[in-house]
Regions:
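Conserved alpha-helical scaffold segments that buttress catalytic/binding sites
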Residues: 1-155
């Protein structure tokens, strides 16, 4: 999830958005203004480095999901920069494994009733090889979300 100078900031400031969570923010990118923003709007956030030290993302996801009302609208944004070695605007060797992201997305999509929004941001291929990787990655995420969310609604 992104957190500065974007539509989420506007939505929080305008009281359109009730809750906001950023899970796995890299500590090196947590500047004082972002921290102040999170505190001002009572945002939930966690650091990626805490997960390296044993914190459970699955537990954090469950906590956040349990804090939502049953039919509360939920939007999901996955910043492709957060995936290790993903061709993206801020590509990094450190980050989530792609299959971890798929697992967590599938978990969220299958466990909540009202998710009209999936935004996959910052993928930025620069050559033909990157095009294939990014294309397949985005396709997997869309298929995972669609099948899990739709299957849950049919059951």
């Amino acid at each position: 999830v992104r957190h500065s100078g974007n539509s989420f900031s506007f939505a929080l400031e305008s009281a359109i958005l009730k809750k906001y969570a950023v899970l796995g923010l890299h500590e090196a990118y947590l500047n004082p203004s972002v921290l102040e923003f999170f505190q001002k709007y009572q945002c939930t956030y966690s650091l990626y480095e805490d997960y390296l030290d044993g914190r459970s993302l699955l537990s954090d996801l469950e906590l956040f999901m349990n804090s939502l009302e049953t039919n509360q609208t939920l939007g999901i944004e996955i910043d492709m920069d957060a995936i290790a070695n993903m061709p993206s605007s801020a590509q990094s060797p450190s980050g989530w494994r792609f299959d971890e992201v798929r697992t967590y997305l599938r978990k969220i999509a299958s466990s909540h009733q009202n998710i009209p929004y999936l935004h996959l941001t910052e993928a930025a291929p620069i050559n033909e090889s990157d095009d294939r990787i990014v294309g397949k990655a985005l396709a997997y995420l869309v298929i995972d979300f669609s099948t899990q969310y739709c299957l849950k609604r049919v059951r």
